[in-house]
Amino acid sequence: GSSGSSGSSGSSGSSGSSGSSGSSGSSGSSGSSGSSGSSGSSGSSGSSGSSGSSGSSGSSGSSGSSGSSGSSGSSGSSGSSGSSSSSSSNGSGSSSGSSQSSGSQGGSSSTSSSN
C-alpha cells in the first residue's frame, strides 16, 4: 500500500582527506511507494582510494521502506573502504538497513528500518 514513512540518513562525519568519494544512493522504489528519506550514505567520506559506499535501496512493489540504507560516518581509511548494503525487497514488504561496514571505518553505521 502507500506508506508515508520518512527517515533521514543520520550519521554523518567529516573527514578531510582527498580521494574519490563515491557514495551512490540509487533509491529506486517502484510501485505505489511513499517512502521518503535519503537512501545512500551521507557524510563526507574522504578516504583516499575507492570509497564505494553503495546503498542501492531497490524496493520494488508497494513498499514504504525508508531510513538510511548504507553506511556513513567518517571513513578515513586509505584503501578500498567498501561498505555495501544492498537492501532489496520484492513484493509488498518493506525492508531496509542491513548495513555491513567492512574495512576500517570509524563512523557510526545507522540501520534505520521503518515498516
UniProtKB/Swiss-Prot annotation:
Main subcellular location of this protein, as a coarse class: secreted
Pfam family, any one: Collagen
GO cellular component: extracellular region
Chain positions covered by the region annotation Disordered: 1-115
Tree of life domain: Eukaryota
Record's keyword terms, sorted: Secreted, Silk protein
Coiled-coil segments on the chain, per record: none
Function: Provides the silk fibroin thread with a sticky coating. Acts as a cement by sticking silk threads together.
Record's protein name: Sericin-1
Organism of derivation: Galleria mellonella
Keyword field contains Secreted: yes
Tissues showing expression: Produced exclusively in the middle (MSG) section of silk glands.
